Amino acid sequence: MGTVSVLYRERKAKFHTVLLDADQTLFDFNKSQRLSLKAALQKNGYPWNEEMNALYSKENLMVWKKFERGEITKERLKIERFENFFYKLGYKNADIAAVNADYIFHLSQCGFTIDDADTLCRALHGVCKLYIATNGIQSVQERRLEKSNIKPYIDGMFISDVLGCQKPAKEYFAFIFHTLQIADKSGVIILGDSLTSDMQG
């Protein structure tokens, strides 16, 4: 984020709109996931350790990539990640729906931001319009923004659940440009942690 901050300080006048990814660009998803998974598993009577967290991270990422490619729906994503997780742990009758519901609830309560995210947003506020562009689950994204220290600086949020298409599809960004009435795309910059999921469209 430090390098990005320098870039914006030097060139901020060139851009009028910044589209920011949510996870690991603004929000500390790794911390939020770890705490939420631990809480959800323990509430439902399952153990938790760092190895399990690493396994879930791997399975979750793989399923999200399938979603970004349009291979599965968001609802299927929520279930499949835990199906794969529990299968590899040897649990045959896990209450996946309950664990997923608790996981999503706890995730929505985590407004943790990464280092300097608030500094960046505060520096750009009033100079550029700041919008979050995310494939994340609507209830999670909206609630954790409310709990975060960056909310005062964010002008809006575009969530794939609401738009009906996801990053990096061209339709996703076309919807944003149409909604914001942006004709000159050269004044827009997209900031994220992944070329394939954030910017390729």
Predicted segments, located by residue:
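Short coil/turn segments at beta-strand junctions that form active-site/ligand-binding loops
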Residues: 14-16, 128-129, 186-187
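Glycine-rich, phosphate-binding/catalytic loops in enzymes
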Residues: 34-38, 148-150, 176
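Substrate-recognition element of Asp-dependent hydrolases with the DxDx(T/V) motif
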Residues: 98-101, 106-112, 117-148, 154-160, ...
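Conserved Lys-Pro-Asp/Glu-containing loop-to-beta segment of HAD-superfamily phosphomonoesterases
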Residues: 166-199
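Short acidic capping loops at alpha-helix termini that bridge into adjacent secondary structure
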Residues: 94-95, 152-156, 184-188
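N-terminal helical cap/lid subdomain that shapes the substrate entry/recognition surface
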Residues: 8-22, 26-115
